[in-house]
UniProtKB/Swiss-Prot annotation:
Protein's UniProt name: Leucine--tRNA ligase
Species of provenance: Citrobacter koseri (strain ATCC BAA-895 / CDC 4225-83 / SGSC4696)
E.C. no: 6.1.1.4
Motif 'HIGH' region: positions: 42-52
Any one Gene Ontology molecular-function term assigned to this protein's record: aminoacyl-tRNA deacylase activity
GO cellular component, one term: cytosol
Protein family membership: Belongs to the class-I aminoacyl-tRNA synthetase family.
Major enzyme class: ligase
């Protein structure tokens, strides 16, 4: 081996070896335990960022470790290749989304290879290819036939100038990102998949996911939002239909003083015909996009419709208001308001002077003080007629029963979860495989016409989807009748909901999945990705698995046994204030910094002399220009150094602070390992290790080696605390560097230790370890080498430390053989001069001995 560690030379050679030998390609093998390690597939944006590198390094470390345990390890990679950014980039670069996407894939693939990830490249897939999305289209038509797919009108963002639908991110301050026209809300027909049909199972099966983070499971529970309540029907004077509301607090029903309906509710629409104020309010609501997340913070507004609803139990007439906090697409589009016991209802009632009627006593039994806020806690009823004195449970049941007896209420389980709207009015996505005949009949595209291929050779005008702009593309024939294809495309979450399963059989042509291969590899053993995907992707991912199970393609209930959510990567962020007061963000690479004695940044400027404001560490992002290019770091230090730093700097699930000084430290450590192996191998052949002939010092060093193996095995395998595993290897390396290397058994022990160190480091730094293993004459390639096993006998301590006390005070510590008798320990204690001086001229009256730990001599 060469004396100097030169990653730029060894890494490309090792990568070439892996390519030629197809080292990481796997097939099903029933004789081996399988392990499926999967990182979330990347969007081909053009370049890898450090968040990618962290995610994929964690996955690669786990995959390589499991492989060394002798398992059949699948670690695939692919590209989540459809999506809106490609359309914007195509317009900007005067190209089409397809070539832009494929160029990015080629570039990023080289970047992944440069980092040495052990992927099975034979399974690579790109979700934008017909070979992939054809099966998704076929599956969608099957779900339609099962009644799990339907079409209904739903609100979208509409630009009246461009006559096009806008994604949420294309609406900036209520205006179109392209032409600055005020965006409207428009109802258009869209396709939905009935995820609500699986709501209970998606909720209950969270209990099966023992190895998913509790935070993710809680987020999914809240998103599904199961609640038990009562659906109540109100008659409305002068209105042909009834109003239905759902409440989880029927105990407060006697305090309902008004109803609120969505601006889009038919009752509000009817009332607006003779009410200009209401009509203007409805118009305002129509053109205001309200996400559910904004509801809590926005100003609550409303207009009285003039209609009065009849309280089913008291017979009182209560007003019906149109309000901006009620959404037509949630529930029935109408809510019951109890301002005495709901803070939102209270604020609205206070603002508009509506009646507030308390019906729940305060905790001390007194009438509640509602002068400043509602009483939202549960309690005992009053002011509620026959229900006075009842607690929450009893009141819930009594009022629910009374409403049911009158035929105006029924108990109901509700979900916050809504069906999955999969229509997108974009071009760069998989076409939705549905057609409409001339008579309006909607049918799934026949199987012999699948896939419905998205044309890739298109011209983007940045306004209308090319398949919507081309009337010829939509024309087709079904059953001999003229038909028009659907020109909407799938939500890109569709592709990422089942890719993990297609990896098990990417070349299979008989169907969506090869059940044999899928059931060998699935479920995924560990899935690695960011927590930002907790409720969208990870919920659809679970839902799709259940759909595929019910179609007979997979036999498990859940797609992944374990979920590991890696933390974000942070970096220093700097800016200077420009002439117009704007912030100009400067890359940390270009910041010249001064630090205090504790290493804190106290002053910074850039090459142009601008005084920089340091804002601290924040998530690497384009907006703050604080991303660090992985490629630059690999070219400077080598892939192994970058990987090692990524795994050492922080626990995998915590944020990682990018510090180049830490990268330099990782590089120095690898150079030390390299140097020690070089010096050891330069001395020539090594004799066999004779454990029975080892000195006490040699035994102690060997004990450290095997204790480190045990710790690293536990840290990587069970605890997944990769940073502490690396720290343990570093600690051992410090001891090895000081160990004598002259005697025959010294060198034999060093050989055993270095073979163990190189294998333990291999998942983290595979290029260097591949080369070091060869230099140490390890058997075969390190990629096929077994993980080192700790020798229990080597870890047994020959001696132990005993604390010696005289009259309860510590006077010394002695080392004795582990099997020493009490007499031998007393004798050894007497020879310790620190102890002996307290025994001089006194009588030992009592001896308290805790074997192997404590000797207390009571003297007088």
């Amino acid at each position: 081996m060469q004396e100097q560690y030169r990653p730029e030379e060894i890494e490309s050679k090792v990568q070439q070896h892996w390519d030629e030998k197809r080292t990481f390609e796997v097939t099903e093998d029933e004789s081996k335990e399988k392990y499926y390690c999967l990182s979330m597939l990347p969007y081909p944006s053009g370049r890898l960022h450090m968040g990618h590198v962290r995610n994929y390094t964690i996955g690669d470390v786990i995959a390589r470790y499991q492989r060394m345990l002798g398992k059949n390890v699948l670690q695939p990679i692919g590209w989540d290749a459809f999506g809106l950014p490609a359309e914007g980039a195509a317009v900007k670069n005067n190209t089409a989304p397809a070539p832009w996407t494929y160029d990015n894939i080629a570039y990023m693939k080289n970047q992944l290879k440069m980092l040495g990830f052990g992927y099975d490249w034979s399974r690579e897939l790109a979700t934008c290819t017909p070979e992939y999305y054809r099966w998704e289209q076929k599956f969608f038509t099957e779900l339609y036939k099962k009644g799990l797919v339907y079409k209904k009108t739903s609100a979208v963002n509409w630009c009246p100038n461009d006559q096009t639908v806008l994604a949420n991110e294309q609406v900036i301050d209520g205006c179109c990102w392209r032409c600055d026209t005020k965006v409207e809300r428009k109802e258009i027909p869209q396709w939905f998949i009935k995820i609500t049909a699986y709501a209970d199972e998606l909720l209950n099966d969270l209990d099966k996911l023992d190895h998913w983070p509790d935070t993710v499971k809680t987020m999914q529970r809240n998103w599904i939002g199961r609640s038990e309540g009562v659906e109540i029907t109100f008659d409305v004077n002068g209105y042909d239909n009834t109003l239905t509301v759902y409440t989880t607090r029927p105990d407060t029903f006697m305090g309902a003083t008004y109803l609120a309906v969505a601006a889009g509710h038919p009752l509000a629409q009817k009332a607006a015909a003779n009410n200009p104020e209401l009509a203007a309010f409805i118009d305002e609501c129509r053109n205001t996009k309200v996400a559910e997340a904004d509801m809590a913070t926005m100003e609550k507004k409303g207009v009285d419709t003039g209609f009065k609803a009849i309280h089913p139990l008291t017979g009182e007439a209560i007003p019906v208001w149109a309000a901006n906090f009620v959404l037509m697409e949630y529930g029935t589009g109408a809510v019951m308001a109890v301002p005495g016991h709901d803070q939102r209802d209270y604020e609205f009632a206070t603002k508009y002077g509506l009646t507030i009627k308390p019906v729940i006593l305060a905790a001390d039994g007194s009438e509640p003080d509602l002068s400043e806020q509602a009483l939202t806690e549960k309690g005992v009823l009053f002011n509620s007629g026959e229900f006075n004195g009842l607690g929450f449970e009893d009141a819930f049941n009594a009022i629910a029963d009374k409403l049911a007896a009158k035929g105006v209420g029924e108990r109901k389980v509700n979900y916050r979860l809504r069906d999955w709207g999969v229509s997108r009015q974009r071009y760069w996505g998989a076409p939705i495989p549905m057609v409409t005949l001339e008579d309006g009949t909607v049918l799934p595209t026949p199987e012999d016409q699948l896939p419905v291929i998205l044309p890739e050779d298109v011209v983007m005008d940045g306004i209308t989807s090319p398949i919507k702009a081309d009337p010829e593309w939509a024309k087709t024939t079904v059953n001999g009748q003229p038909a028009l294809r659907e020109t909407d495309t799938f939500d890109t979450f569709m592709e990422s909901s089942w890719y993990y399963a297609r990896y098990t059989c990417p070349q299979y042509n008989e169907g969506m999945l090869d059940p044999e291969a899928a059931n060998y590899w699935l479920p995924v053993d560990i899935y690695i990705g960011g927590i930002e995907h907790a409720i969208m992707h990870l919920l659809y991912f679970r839902f799709f698995h259940k759909l595929m199970r019910d179609a007979g393609m997979v036999n498990s209930d859940e797609p992944a046994k374990q979920l590991l959510c890696q933390g974000m990567v942070l970096a220093d962020a700097f800016y200077y204030v420009g002439e117009n007061g704007e912030r100009n963000w400067v890359s940390p690479v270009d910041a010249i910094v001064e630090r205090d004695e504790k290493g804190r940044i106290v002053k910074a400027k850039d090459a142009a002399g601008h005084e920089l404001v340091y804002t601290g560490m924040s998530k690497m992002s384009k907006s703050k220009n604080n991303g660090i290019d992985p490629q630059v770091m690999v070219e400077r230090y080598g892939a192994d150094t970058v990987r090692l730093f990524m795994m050492f700097a922080s626990p995998a699930d915590m944020t990682l602070e990018w510090q180049e000084s830490g990268v330099e430290g990782a590089n120095r450590f690898l150079k030390r390992v390299w140097k020690l192996v070089y010096e050891h191998t330069a001395k020539g052949e090594v004799a066999a290790l004779n454990v029975d002939a080892l000195s006490e010092d040699q035994k102690a060093l060997r004990r450290d080696v095997h204790k480190t193996i045990a710790k690293v095995t536990d840290d990587i395998g069970r605890r997944q605390t990769f940073n502490t595993a690396i720290a343990a290897i570093m600690e051992l390396m410090n001891k090895l560097a000081k160990a004598p290397q002259e005697g025959e058994q010294d060198r034999a022990l060093m050989q055993e230790a270095l073979l163990a160190v190189v294998r333990m480091l291999n998942p983290f730094t595979p290029h260097a370890c591949f080369t070091l293993w060869e230099a140490l004459k390890g058997e075969g390639d390190i990629d096929n080498a077994p993980w080192p096993v700790a020798d229990d006998k080597a870890m047994v301590e020959d001696s132990t430390l005993v604390v010696v006390q005289v009259n309860g005070k510590v006077r010394g510590k002695i080392t004795v053989p582990v099997n020493a008798t009490e007499e031998q320990v007393r004798e050894r204690a007497g020879q310790e001069h620190l102890v002996a001086k307290y025994l001089d001229g006194v009588t030992v009256r009592k001896v308290i001995y805790v074997p192997g730990k404590l000797l207390n001599l009571v003297v007088g």
